[in-house]
């Protein structure tokens, strides 16, 4: 256990060329890819409504379960999935309260980490899937990490993008912020739609572009907002599709000790793709500590640093796809 390959990909060494590698002096057949149109909308009934998704590839095979980041949606994978092999299936999910999925009923809070683990389990049990492969970005990667730790014998491969484990907060910060978070949650819960800000399409795109602070470019924002906003006919403008209550994220955060305890439970093969510079973490050392802990316990760990923003799989998917393809092909 603990076998590791560490690779640093530079802009001058573009991984896109690895899609058609040469082996033993002979050029392999070009890899057949999924392409942009190989998906269908997919709906999963849950007790509070539906979880909506995009199913990429054939429904005749068990899919990779893909989970997006906080306040994003499954459109986050719209540029990556087309670059994956045609014999791959991916179920990219809109997490509850995101994209086209149902919001939680009034009176309920989003405990995003614990809710997400339960959602994955609900789906796996519903379809009786075995030896699952999980793909996650940011929050989605924290959820897949937690699931792999909670069900260590039932996950075959774990692929995470620019996240090592759940977001870590200092205990003092969590204690000091709890009251404000609860009041903020209740304010959002009681805010009527008539008082929610409404924007023109162009205003919405600019607002989101500015909010992501360089992590995405304008074409990427347009991809995300295909599922991230909804039209309001009465105001002739657009509202965010996501549940406003999701903006309260402090509740349910982890300490470093908790995250490392879960890391020690993971036994599957792991690919971790970290963007450089990627996301700015409050506790950057924890990322390295999680990877080190995984190396001690997981069947195999591949840690790769790739030039890009936190949303590198969306903005520069050609840099990310070759690493995933290679990892999926490995026995």
From Swiss-Prot:
Q: Which GO terms describe its molecular function?
A: carboxylic ester hydrolase activity; hydrolase activity; serine hydrolase activity
What is its EC class?
hydrolase
The record's annotation in InterPro entries points to: AB_hydrolase_1, AB_hydrolase_fold, AB_hydrolase_sf
Sequence ranges assigned to domain AB hydrolase-1 in this UniProt record: 63-163
Q: Name one Pfam family in it.
A: Abhydrolase_1
| Location of the region described as Disordered in the Swiss-Prot/TrEMBL record | 1-28
Catalytic residues, chain numbering: 138
Which controlled-vocabulary keywords does the entry list? Detoxification, Developmental protein, Digestion, Hydrolase, Serine esterase
Q: Name one GO biological process term.
A: digestion
Composition bias (Low complexity) maps to 7-17
Tell whether Hydrolase is among the UniProt keywords.
yes
Query: Hey, what tissues is this thing expressed in?
Result: Ubiquitously expressed before embryonic stage 11. At stage 11, expression is concentrated in the foregut and posterior midgut. By stage 15, in gastric caeca, pharynx, posterior spiracles and anterior edge of midgut. At the end of embryogenesis, expression is confined to gastric caeca. During third instar larvae, expressed at low levels in gastric caeca, midgut and hindgut and high level in fat body.
EC assignment: 3.1.-.-
Q: Which family does it belong to?
A: Belongs to the AB hydrolase superfamily.
Q: What does this protein do?
A: May have a role in detoxification and digestion during embryogenesis and larval development.
Protein name in UniProt: Probable serine hydrolase
Gene expressing this chain: kraken
């Amino acid at each position: 256990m603990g076998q590791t390959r560490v690779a640093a990909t530079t802009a001058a060494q573009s991984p896109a060329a690895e899609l058609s590698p040469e082996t033993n002096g002979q050029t392999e057949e070009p890899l057949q890819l999924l392409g942009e149109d190989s998906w269908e909308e997919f709906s999963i009934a849950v007790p509070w409504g539906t979880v909506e998704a995009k199913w990429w590839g054939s429904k005749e095979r068990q899919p990779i379960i893909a989970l997006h980041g906080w306040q994003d949606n499954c459109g986050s994978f719209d540029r990556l999935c087309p670059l994956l092999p045609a014999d791959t299936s991916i179920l990219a999910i809109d997490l509850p309260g995101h994209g086209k999925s149902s919001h939680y009923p009034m009176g309920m809070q989003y405990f995003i980490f614990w809710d997400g683990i339960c959602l994955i389990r609900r789906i796996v049990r519903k379809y009786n899937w075995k030896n699952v492969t999980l793909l996650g970005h940011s929050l989605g990667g924290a959820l897949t990490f937690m699931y792999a730790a909670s069900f260590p014998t039932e996950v075959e491969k774990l692929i995470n993008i620019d996240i090592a484990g759940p977001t870590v907060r200092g205990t003092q910060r969590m204690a000091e912020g709890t009251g404000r978070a609860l009041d903020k949650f209740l304010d959002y819960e009681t805010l009527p739609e008539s008082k929610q800000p409404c924007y023109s399409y162009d205003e919405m795109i600019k607002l989101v572009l500015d909010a992501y602070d360089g992590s995405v470019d304008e074409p990427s924002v347009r991809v995300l907002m295909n599922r991230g906003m909804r039209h309001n006919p009465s105001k002739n403008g657009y509202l965010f599709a996501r549940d406003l209550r999701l903006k309260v994220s402090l509740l349910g955060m982890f300490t470093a000790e908790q995250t490392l305890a879960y890391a020690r439970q993971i036994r599957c093969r792991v690919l971790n793709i970290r963007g450089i510079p990627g996301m700015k973490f409050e506790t950057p050392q924890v990322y390295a500590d999680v990877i080190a802990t995984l190396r001690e316990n997981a069947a195999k760990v591949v840690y790769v640093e790739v030039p890009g923003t936190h949303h590198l799989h969306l903005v520069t998917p050609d840099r990310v796809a070759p690493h995933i393809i290679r990892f999926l092909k490995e026995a």
